[in-house]
Amino acid sequence: MKTQRADYSLKVTNYNKDRNNYHCEVKLPIKLGWFYNVKLLIDDGNSISYRNLSHKKNEGDYAIFEGDVTLETSAIYRYCFSYDVDGRTYYFNANGLQNDSFLSDDCFKLSVNFEVPKWAQGKIMYHIFVDRFNKSNDNKLQEMPRRVIHDNWNEEMHLGPEKETSKIYGKEIWNIDFYGGNLKGITEKLDYIKSLGVSILYLSPIVHSQSNHRYDTADYENVDPYAGCNKDLKVLCDEAHKRGMKVVLDAVFNHTGNDSKYFDEYKSFDGEGAYNNPMSKYSNFYKRHYEKGKIYYDYWWGFENLPECDCESKEWQEYITGVGGVIDKWFDLGIDGLRLDVADELSDDFIEKIRIAVKRNKVDGFIMGEVWKNPMRMGRGYISSGKCMDTVMNYPLIDALLRYYKYADCNKLDYIIRDILREYPEETINSLMNFTSTHDISRAINYFTDENEFTEYAEWAWDLKNNDLNYLKNKKLSKEEYEKAKEKYKSYLFALYFLPGNVSVFYGDEVGVDGYGNLLNRKTYPWGMEDKDLLEYFKKLGKDRNNELFLETAGLKLRDINSDYFSYERIGPKDKMLVITNRSGKEGRILIPPEYNDEKTKIYTLNKSTKDIITPYGAIAIKKAC
């Protein structure tokens, strides 16, 4: 890693990866005077230490100081160097030359023992809710207990509990209406997905489950019959790999379903589940407590269809991560990585074992976690230990971006971006999941309407004022509302596509699928009724992003965030790019830095913006050599 400011340069080189040995070289201009006490200062998060650097030689007008340091612990280190001259101490950090005290937040950052697979950095991801994406013609669904089958792909989904089924079982049973989207259906559409520039396919859970979302696992070892079979997963992975795409599977290891072979509340399986048999071989899989001599099982957030697993249980860990266990079986079928559901509720020890199992199968296996807050500040080793996950879903950034584009909240966006740059490992930043939307929040297009359905000062930008499903069901966008929202949406997408991380497109966002809140956001993909204009825009963004390979790992520098414009730079070893987006409906004049005004630039635009004029909801990206 080399950093240079004017006459100063600092280079830190990892010359022995196995031992984490680093060599530090500092170049200082001789004209400044007689240097002494040249030191490298290192903050490991717990304490600040220093290494004396020795004068090795003079090279032209520079004095060269060098030294070696061993960083044994996986951590994010912050460092700078200092020197004394004429009786004063100077610090050289990320902000340039300072003559005041050492401040860790201003230091350069060095991530030790953090390696994310190259294929998972700076790519485009496609997130599929399997039941709602595409149904192959041969998928004839057979009736099964506690399942409802739709006759028509385009008919409305069921909202709320299924009345008849709930009555039979004496409790509310939701999300059991199926359209039949399946793995073969996805395989049939791989060329379409590839046309969006996608190289990572992220599938919602596919294993046997009672519900259509399949976060209530019934059998980890077999694909749900409505989604296909294990062979179909193998074929999908093989065909995806032929097209240069990797496959990431949603992994739900925090809880199972109550209607599963492990819990088996309804005796749907062999009756040997933990619910009816305290001596079951599965009973140690679950969290439980005793009251008056009776066993009571714990349920995830009180949902009675989701008994909570005991992540500290050796039996449970072995079943999932042991040799020949669940993870091994999935990787045998060809997957390339996992997204850990509710990762913040899994123990670090369990996640470490998951990582060992993943890497046992594929050295470049990828692990992404569902963590909603800054993972570096939760007192956990999700990322910082270097032994758990590679990256997380980027809820903080998406929340801040949405607030900026809807409410002009400049401060939040500035704070979150600087927070991420300061605290996350570089390769984690490059692989963050920057999503258009997900199965848990409203569709992106809804957010950009003038409708006042969202709460500006809620915890999250997508929090709704009214969560009543019947109310939200009737909130349909008019053509005029949709087109106006699409203008803003495009500007937002332009900014999103050029930022660090993986852009994740939730199926249907590229063609204008709408829906407020959880459930209504899970409509079927509208084959034959797509918004072709929006689709072409997504294809163009994907092509533009993939054309600039340096963006996969380029750094990020904020330029300006004001009530109209958001601008930033991406800076790589050989190329850099200036990005400016207009969140307002006003045309404006912009002042481009001189270095971006030469003839040797490449330009990407939205709404015919130029280097002089940025159009309403327009944008421009200018790439040049460094």
Predicted regions and their residues:
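Carbohydrate-binding surface patches
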Residues: 13, 559-595
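Glycan-association/targeting regions that enable binding to alpha-glucans and other polysaccharides
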Residues: 1-127, 135
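Active-site-proximal helices and loops of the catalytic beta/alpha 8
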Residues: 237-246, 254-255, 260-271, 326-328, ...
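C-terminal beta-strand-rich structural cap/linker in extracellular carbohydrate-active enzymes
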Residues: 124, 608-626
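Substrate-binding/active-site clefts of carbohydrate-active enzymes
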Residues: 130-200, 206-333, 354-360, 377-378
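Aromatic/acidic polysaccharide-binding cleft in carbohydrate-active enzymes
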Residues: 131, 382, 434-468, 472, ...
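Structural recognition of the beta-strand scaffold that forms the well-ordered cores
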Residues: 125-127, 200-204, 248-249, 338-339, ...
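Conserved, mostly hydrophobic/aromatic
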Residues: 128, 193, 203, 220, ...
